[in-house]
Amino acid sequence: MEKNYFKKIIARDANGLQVISACCSDSKVKIEDIKFLKKNKIFLLLIERIKKEKKSEEKLKSIIKFEYIASVKSKNINQNNNSDILELLGIDLFRDKKNYNISIYFKNNAFITLSSEILEVTLEDQSEQ
């Protein structure tokens, strides 16, 4: 009997974030599944991703959780159309004087930029489809 283990990857540096980005590239995200919990300083993406670790076409529901987020900016994303689906291309990290700027890139030149003093990002698988 094969056991199913769901992954949980925690990134606290640029290398860890690259691993999460690689696992999540080509994922689908509904606009309604993007949430910023300002009071808790948490930004969430519920994604449908392909399980690249096993080189299969198996699809998973996963959550990418960004913690300690001070601000969120987006461009070329129509937030009024909740049913639109974005395709995630990758996640990148830039550092200025005291903050991390995390850029989440989607197809069609859409992106979200998160600002945080501390880098902590978690990718956690929720269920197989």
Outline where the language-model segments fall:
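Surface-exposed, interaction-prone regions used to assemble/regulate multi-protein complexes
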Residues: 1-129
